């Protein structure tokens, strides 16, 4: 049963980026290459819902994001990942003299001049930043109150430049969203409680600056894992070793528990714990092998023969469902390992 599990946080795991850079590219500049055009926030288009029982009002507006704030946030987040030796920021608009808003990439001459002036090996430029902002007021019947909410969808465009290339190495067009909410006893109060527009636009720009980072450099991702802690004395004793961070001792007891029983459910629990142990040791291939074993035992205990995976009821097969999700994640990490090693070769695989 899932009730026999205890939750734990493992150390962060490193996720590879979409882009890969040669190890010799160690200094980077983050620049603002957006056009210095007037902010073109539109008057919100407000609509009252016909169904006043749920949605009271909805307003949609469009705006240019603050590129200076976004550029600073992107530089800070990239520096925080400690991937490049040096991160330089140039948040002043390179196209400050533009009279008409336009999206224009840097020329090779501009890239060379910037790289020389800033003393860097490559340029990462914010090219454009657009927002779509939706503000709603709803009545939450189950709580007897009103919810004021803002959903800001951000659309950053970022290009990566190398001095020796005539065109960008890559251009990334992304979208993501950030959400705020507050509550009140009336629609007016709920709308008034929500974050002020000025603060919302600033936070949305900061968020937008962080969105491209995981596509550019490897990032650390925190993960949670579950361990089975009951069912036998060795399993309970192993849980104590885990609390003391004595993973090798815990592994010995889990292996003992697995080898000493023919019960499919007990084997499933021990095998899953062993998979987590090997993941903690960065032995992803062994972790995947043991998670596969745990999944096979779970299938025997919780599923009927020839059950279609697409028709699995999670309430009837909670262990099989969780272990399958975990196995999928391990397979993804394993498949990305060679790419991650390539990207981290600048650190001599010390990560």
Where are the regions a protein language model picked out?
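N-terminal segment of the mature soluble domain
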Residues: 32-125, 165-170, 303, 310-351
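Long, contiguous interaction/recruitment modules in multidomain scaffold/adaptor proteins
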Residues: 66-78, 84-230
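Alpha-helical protein-protein interaction scaffolds
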Residues: 231-351
């Amino acid at each position: 049963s899932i009730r026999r599990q205890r939750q734990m946080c493992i150390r962060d795991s490193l996720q590879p980026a979409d882009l890969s850079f040669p190890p010799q590219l160690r200094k980077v500049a983050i620049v603002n290459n957006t056009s210095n055009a007037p902010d073109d926030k539109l008057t919100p288009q407000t609509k009252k819902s016909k169904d006043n029982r749920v949605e009271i009002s909805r307003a949609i507006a469009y705006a240019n994001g603050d590129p200076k704030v976004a550029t600073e946030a992107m530089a800070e987040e990239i520096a925080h990942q400690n991937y490049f030796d040096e991160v330089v920021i140039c948040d002043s608009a390179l196209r400050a003299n533009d009279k008409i808003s336009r999206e224009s990439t840097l020329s090779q001459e501009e890239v060379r001049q910037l790289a020389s002036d800033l003393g860097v090996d490559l340029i990462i430029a914010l090219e454009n930043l657009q927002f779509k902002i939706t503000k709603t007021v709803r009545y939450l019947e189950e709580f007897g109150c009103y919810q004021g909410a803002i959903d800001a969808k951000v659309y950053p465009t970022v290009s990566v430049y190398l001095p020796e290339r005539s065109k960008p190495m890559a251009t990334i067009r992304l979208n993501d969203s950030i959400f705020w909410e507050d509550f009140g006893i009336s629609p007016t109060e709920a709308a008034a409680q929500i974050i002020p527009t000025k603060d919302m636009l600033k936070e949305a720009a900061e968020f937008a600056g962080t969105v491209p980072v995981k596509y550019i450099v490897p990032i650390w991702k925190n993960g949670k894992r579950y361990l089975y802690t009951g069912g036998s004395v060795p399993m309970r004793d192993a849980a104590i070793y885990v609390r003391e961070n004595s993973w090798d001792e815990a592994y010995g007891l889990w292996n003992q528990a697995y080898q000493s029983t023919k019960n499919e459910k007990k084997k499933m629990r021990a095998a899953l714990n062993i998979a987590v142990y090997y993941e903690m040791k960065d032995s992803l291939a062994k972790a995947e092998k043991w998670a596969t074993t745990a999944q096979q035992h779970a299938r025997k205990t919780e599923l009927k023969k020839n059950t279609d995976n697409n028709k699995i009821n999670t309430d009837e097969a909670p262990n099989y469902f969780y272990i399958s999700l975990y196995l999928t994640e391990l397979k993804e990490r394993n498949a990305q390992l060679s790419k991650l090693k390539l990207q981290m070769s600048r650190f001599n695989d010390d990560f």
